[in-house]
């Protein structure tokens, strides 16, 4: 019976609680072993911590792959489409497939760049130009497909656009543009060069995969999208703090594309941009204070302030999306008040990340390793 359940469209719902408690137990076991190792064999603790990190990363990578497959099976199934009055044919053709192509192109480009960085550095520049062109074309194709989907299924649906609610397209595009300007403008304060090497790309891949897996370990779900997770943004914020804001914003943008593939409720191209690539690019702002001398000996404070700034920028993106795209969810309430209150869950997520980040930076071994990586990327 369990096997049949796993093979059904409801496999995600069967697997999710099992994975949640398995992951909590796995992490708790690693923490317990680390505590024992630290108090009994301090001379080998650094090596243990490094090995534990890669074991956890491998576990979360497998978990992410399983969750991703099951999530697609659930949200793009005939059953889910029928229950939610979705047109499965257009949903797959105009939302899922273009998003999968974009993610494939982006990830392939990053892998190619990483390999060239290590084995053929002279070929990086022409490859980068071509890869950026292909990725831009794939992103434009996604936006065009979402525009077609909006016109066919959302524009006159009687729900998102009705007598009491409308999707404000111009405001959405302006909100997305202003959010990009805000995030890009803040990256100016990061004086480190925007140059990836094989190591920074490897860490980007590992930490993004860890964030993706942890995003499925939900402490609670919001009714119309969004959730408080088991510190899923911690790996991304740590990456930004160690490797710099510019790299963090770029990795967050790419991570946002991966997150968007899971969501069958992409109703407008600008809403997609605000909630996913731009919203998660904002997470990279966590690194704004990492290279500031005032926080050199107090990384806990620098990381905490950076996390609050990043969470606030992400919050703004979600609020704008809620106000201008999802007015229907407010059901007659003041849409600004509704969106501000609804999206406040972001700060609960950030608070958990800050607690975990402070605990990590209170470890001399972790701080030493992080500082070594930070100096190497100045």
Say what each PLM segment does:
Residues 1-18, 78-88, 152-164:
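Short, strongly hydrophobic alpha-helical membrane anchors
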Residues 30-33, 110-114, 177-190, 204-208, ...:
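Short helix-perturbing small/polar motifs within transmembrane alpha-helices
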């Amino acid at each position: 019976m369990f096997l049949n359940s796993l093979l059904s469209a409801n496999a995600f719902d069967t697997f999710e609680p099992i994975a949640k408690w398995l992951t909590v137990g796995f992490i708790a076991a690693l923490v317990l072993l680390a505590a024992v190792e630290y108090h009994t064999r301090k001379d080998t603790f650094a090596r243990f911590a490094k090995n534990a990190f890669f074991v956890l990363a491998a576990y979360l990578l497998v978990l992410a792959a399983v969750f991703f497959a099951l999530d697609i099976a659930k949200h793009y199934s005939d059953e889910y489409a029928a229950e939610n009055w979705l047109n499965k044919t257009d949903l797959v053709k105009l939302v899922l497939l273009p998003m999968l192509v974009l993610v494939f192109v982006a990830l392939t480009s990053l892998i190619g760049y990483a390999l060239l960085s290590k084995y053929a550095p002279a070929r990086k520049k022409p490859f980068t130009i071509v890869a950026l062109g292909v990725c831009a074309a794939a992103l434009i194709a996604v936006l065009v497909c979402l525009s077609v989907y909006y016109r066919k299924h959302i524009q006159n649906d009687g729900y998102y656009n009705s007598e009491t609610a409308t999707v404000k397209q111009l405001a959405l595009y302006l909100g997305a543009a202003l959010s990009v300007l805000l995030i890009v403008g803040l990256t100016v304060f990061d004086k480190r060069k925007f140059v990836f090497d094989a190591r920074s790309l490897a860490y980007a891949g590992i930490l993004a995969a860890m964030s993706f897996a942890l995003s499925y370990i939900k402490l609670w779900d919001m009714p119309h999208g969004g959730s408080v997770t088991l510190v899923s943004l911690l790996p991304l914020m740590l990456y930004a703090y160690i490797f710099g804001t510019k790299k963090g914003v770029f990795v967050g943008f790419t991570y946002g594309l991966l997150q968007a593939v899971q969501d069958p409720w992409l109703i407008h191209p600008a809403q997609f941009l605000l909630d996913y690539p731009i919203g998660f690019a904002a997470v990279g702002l966590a690194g704004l204070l990492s290279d500031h001398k005032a926080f050199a000996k107090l990384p806990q404070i620098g990381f905490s302030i950076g996390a609050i700034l990043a969470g606030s920028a992400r919050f703004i993106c979600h609020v704008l999306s809620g106000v201008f795209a999802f007015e229907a969810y407010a059901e007659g309430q003041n849409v600004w008040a509704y969106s501000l209150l609804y999206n406040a869950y972001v700060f609960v997520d950030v608070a958990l990340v800050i607690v975990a980040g402070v605990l990590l930076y209170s470890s001399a071994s972790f701080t030493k390793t992080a500082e070594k990586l930070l100096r190497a990327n100045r």
